Regions:
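Short gly/ser/thr-rich secondary-structure transition/capping motifs
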Residues: 25-32, 44-49, 118-126, 173-181
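Phosphate-binding beta-alpha-beta segment of Rossmann-like dinucleotide-binding domains, i.e.
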Residues: 82-137
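An N-terminal-biased, well-structured beta-alpha scaffold segment characteristic
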Residues: 1-85, 189
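Rossmann-like dinucleotide/phosphate-binding beta-alpha-beta segment
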Residues: 129-193
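Generic structural signal for small/hydrophobic residues in well-ordered secondary structure
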Residues: 18, 46, 64, 101, ...
Length: 194
């Protein structure tokens, strides 16, 4: 029976879904810390990142689906068999991480971390002026999936957004100006939020 090694965290309902769709496969679930050579040697499909040094031992591997956007170490010479397909998770984290970044900005601008401490100590204490996102300048360094989604959210809240990317590319409507990394020294003093 063909084997699928799953190293990404899956809920019980996800296991049932996978096993229902892949009835011809034997599923092996391991955490990244539990993976051994014997887990990978006969796996034809691996879902999730495994230690790169174990990949060459997976001689039957046909498909490796990473749970990260980065894949550089897996593309090095001698890591994958020539006919193994590799897929990464580019685009999978933009929404969640950009929302997390927005929460961090709001926490700092509104001093929520200070008010949380006060609340725990049963204090009602003014922590001074809080700042709005509206009319601020946000400098987004990196306009991949995460940076672009964050820039779009900041723009929607009224911030003027300046983007920095490695290579010249078209400017999205939600970004006022797209610059390159060598412009950082000029841009940083203008930014309220980086």
């Amino acid at each position: 029976m063909k084997k699928i090694l799953v190293t990404i965290p899956v809920r019980e309902k996800d296991r049932k879904f996978l096993e229902e769709k892949g009835k011809e496969f034997q599923f092996c679930y391991r955490t990244k810390e539990e993976i051994t050579v014997s887990d990978v040697v006969d796996a034809e499909i691996i879902l999730g990142n495994i230690p790169v040094e174990l990949v060459p031992k997976a001689k039957k591997l046909k498909f490796l689906q990473l749970d990260s956007a980065g894949s550089t170490e897996y593309t090095a010479s001698g890591v994958l068999m020539p006919d193994t397909k590799l897929a990464n998770a580019t685009g999978a984290y933009g929404l969640a991480i950009s929302e997390y970044m927005l929460a961090g900005v709001l926490m700092l601008r509104k001093k929520l971390h200070l008010y949380q401490k006060n609340m725990e100590q049963h204090l009602w204490k003014d922590e001074g002026e809080v700042l709005s996102i509206r009319d601020s300048v946000t400098l987004v360094v990196g306009l991949g999936d995460i940076g672009s989604q964050f820039a779009e959210k900041m723009h929607a809240l009224g911030s003027e957004v300046i983007g920095v990317r490695k290579h010249k590319a078209a400017r999205p409507d939600y970004i006022k100006e797209v610059c390159q990394q060598e412009d950082l020294d000029r841009l940083l003093p203008k930014a309220d939020i980086v």
